[in-house]
UniProtKB/Swiss-Prot annotation:
It is found in: Cytoplasm. Disulfide bonds: none annotated. Belongs to the TRAFAC class translation factor GTPase superfamily. Classic translation factor GTPase family. EF-G/EF-2 subfamily. Keywords: Cytoplasm, Elongation factor, GTP-binding, Nucleotide-binding, Protein biosynthesis. It comes from Limosilactobacillus fermentum (strain NBRC 3956 / LMG 18251) (Lactobacillus fermentum). It comes from the Bacteria. Pfam families: EF-G_D2, EFG_C, EFG_III, EFG_IV, GTP_EFTU. The lineage of its organism: Bacteria, Bacillati, Bacillota, Bacilli, Lactobacillales. GTP binds at residues 19-26, 83-87, 137-140. The gene is fusA. This is Elongation factor G.
């Protein structure tokens, strides 16, 4: 058990590997682990043998679902790697990873360049100010084109790429790369799993092109670096070290994004990519100070260092079959020994760290202490959930929490037997702890269990995990859309609840003004009572009554959202008034306001990006309009077209099959939640009728 810092902070890298699905990201991570000596046999994703894809569901589907954290050592530096999913249903895993990373490697498919999901994860990385390198992977693939990939970075991501290599050959002829910084060539030995390569002079027939690309690289650097600009204008020699220092600074400032070439599957270019991680991506010391807040709400800037009070963020909860509940931590400042107490500043509870583990995919090495800049997993934290701040009990700090999107799709799940009921309940509770975008609840009227998530694949995998990890056999209903309800007009209404039939009666009377708010604003309650017409002690009951009534909506039983309620008048009875009576009165006011408040049903609208061959463009546009969608623009993608559109989620069920048959399997689409919008009147009536009205 190691207990002193093995690698200085400057020699630590916390990086993520991010990409569009099928760009070869998991294979690239595998190769990193192989060359850094962490694994002895390479696992291929398409054989279901990859180390990082450790859940059974991932092995079967060949996609990465949970971002496994692993640690590796390259040269004299420790690299903590978080492998993130590329499928849109799992964007929350990407957000979680980016929140705690210092830098990232974006893997592109060199034939496709920047794809829709690349754009999504790139924008997420922008939100978290994460410096990035780009690795144009699959250079051995038919149609691979490095220059095209670089062009797509510029055009689709709207940033300045900096090619620091050029490939030697492409497709079957891909043999190695030219290093434009050192101006040498690396030619790989075909037989040795990429472990051997020769550093040679640039081939004579490529020398002129390499020179001109080197000059272009220097010009791009000169635009963002005054020292390079000065030497460039004077025609002075610029050393390799000066070039590297300038690239590093421009990468850290996110002014430039170095681009490299390789083929993870054919074992080419990975070691150079690792060198670039060391040369150009930040250590915890290089990143901007992290902002936290003390108990008074004052902003405090945290910079990495072991000699400061302990502060960490819990960024993921996972259930391990052998050790139970694992809490993944990113330590920002200070150090922590196993067995010590921490304060969960988010929940205001003290917790004891049982054991500390360093993770390698799903295998663990026990350690006795973690330090500033580390990523590790803790056992023993019972009350900690994703996004909680863990700090030194004497120095409580609130690290900025994470925001997660609300689920947009739900299905009912029913246990097949009584024994399955308990297993299912336990499993759903555990899975909801792990994943903030997954929710499970019981419908109070029908008693059925509903699970909600970010997409069909997300829920498929939840059900699969119930079966596999918790032995719960369940029947799954048809997917349903998570509709909402909203007012569209300002309206005032009275709610009066009076019951006087012998004995103690009930009396509550309120006047409330309801004002619709913009999407995502939530519920706001305003107490505007003057002169005690509604006594103080009943006002919280009015607010609570409204909240409970809003949960069940006013039209078809869906939650009513984004509403400001101003309680401005009412009356009470000395004897008969009670909290319960005012709760009922508040719910009646809401019900009475609905007809004049222009209540509507809102549906989730998805951003749907469809890539289809040119010949099928007419069909695809027809698909969008037939599904009540709108086209938002098109771009050429080689000999295919990318159609940007917005389509209601309710119309997208089963679309994968439609697209597959229309394009003979050549079309693909990605779908992410964009916003909520009112459904057309006719559809609103159908929904109300189907739900039996209110």
């Amino acid at each position: 058990m190691a207990n002193k810092r093995e690698y200085p902070l400057e020699k630590t890298r916390n990086i993520g590997i991010m990409a569009h699905i099928d760009a070869g990201k998991t294979t690239a991570t595998e190769r990193i682990l192989y060359y850094t000596g962490k694994i002895h046999k390479i696992g291929e994703t398409h054989d279901g043998a990859s180390q990082m894809d450790w859940m059974e569901e991932e092995k079967e589907r060949g996609i990465t679902i949970t971002s496994a954290a692993t640690t590796a050592v390259w040269k004299d530096t420790r690299i903590n790697i978080i492998d993130t999913p590329g499928h849109v249903d799992f964007t929350v895993e990407v957000e979680r990873a980016l929140r705690v990373l210092d830098g990232a490697v974006t893997v592109l498919d060199a034939q496709a360049g920047v794809e829709p999901q690349t754009e999504t994860v790139w924008r997420q990385a922008d939100d978290f100010n994460v410096p990035r390198l780009v690795f144009a992977n699959k250079m051995d693939k038919m149609g691979a084109n490095f220059d095209y990939s670089v062009k797509t970075i510029k055009e689709r991501l709207n940033v300045t790429p900096l090619p620091i290599q050029m490939p030697i050959g492409a497709e079957d002829e891909f043999a190695g790369v030219i290093d434009l910084v050192k101006m040498v060539a690396y030619i790989y030995d075909e037989d040795k799993l990429g472990e051997n390569w020769d550093t040679v002079e640039i081939p004579a027939d490529m020398k002129d092109e390499a020179e001109s690309r080197h000059d272009a690289m220097i010009e791009t650097l000169a635009d963002v670096n005054d020292d390079i600009m000065e030497k460039y204008l004077e025609g002075a020699e610029i050393s390799v070290d000066e070039i590297k220092a300038a690239i590093r600074q421009a990468t850290l400032d996110q002014e430039l994004f170095p681009v490299m070439a390789g083929s993870a599957y054919k074992d080419k270019g990975i070691q150079m990519m690792l060198d670039a991680v060391l040369d150009y991506l930040p250590s915890p010391v290089d990143v901007k100070p992290f902002v936290a807040h003390d108990e008074e709400g004052n902003a405090i800037e945290l910079t990495a260092g072991d000699d400061k009070p302990f502060a960490a963020l819990a960024f993921k909860i996972a259930t391990d079959p052998f050790v139970g509940r694992l809490t993944f931590l990113r330590v920002y400042t200070g150090s922590l020994k196993s067995g010590s107490y921490v304060l969960n500043a988010t929940k205001g509870k003290r917790e004891r760290i049982g054991r500390l583990l360093q993770m390698h995919s799903n295998q663990q090495n026990e350690i006795s202490e973690v330090f500033s800049g580390d990523i590790a997993a803790a056992i023993g934290l019972k009350n900690t959930t994703t996004g909680d701040s863990l700090t030194d009990p004497d120095h409580p700090l609130q690290l900025e929490s994470m925001d997660f999107p609300e689920p947009v799709i739900q299905v009912s799940v029913e246990p097949k037997s009584k024994a399955d009921q308990d297993k299912m309940d336990k499993g759903l509770q555990k899975l909801a702890e792990e994943d903030p975008t997954f929710k499970a609840e019981t419908n109070p009227e029908t008693g059925e269990t509903l699970i909600a998530g970010m997409g069909e694949l997300h829920l498929d995998i939840i059900v699969e995990r119930l079966r596999r990890e918790f032995n719960a056999e369940v029947t799954v209903g048809k997917p349903q859309v998570s509709y909402r309800e909203a007012f569209t007009k300002q309206v005032s209404a009275q709610g009066k609840f009076v019951r006087q039939s012998g004995g103690k009666g009930q009396y509550g009377d309120v006047w409330i003004e309801f004002t619709p708010l913009e999407e995502g604003a939530g519920f706001e309650f305003e107490d505007a009572i003057v002169g005690g017409v509604v006594p103080r002690e009943y006002i919280p009951a009015v607010e609570q009554g409204l909240k409970e009534a809003m949960e069940n909506g006013v039209l078809a039983g869906y939650p009513l959202v984004d509403l400001h309620a101003k309680l401005y008048d009412g009356s009470y009875h000395e004897v008969d008034s009670s909290e319960a009576a005012f709760k009922v009165a508040a719910s009646l006011a809401l019900r009475n306001a609905a007809p004049k408040g222009g209540a509507v049903i809102l549906e989730p609208i998805m951003k749907v990006d469809i890539v289809a061959p040119e010949d099928n463009l007419g069909d695809v546009m027809g698909h969008v309009t037939a599904r009540r969608g709108s086209i938002d623009g098109m771009e050429e993608r080689g000999n295919a077209q990318l159609v940007h559109s917005f389509v209601p989620l309710s119309e997208m069920f089963g679309y994968a099959t439609t697209l597959r048959s229309a394009t003979q399997g050549r079309g693909t689409f990605t779908m992410t939640f964009d916003h909520y919008s009112a459904v057309p009147k006719s559809i609103q009536e159908e929904i109300i009728e189907k739900n039996g009205g209110k």
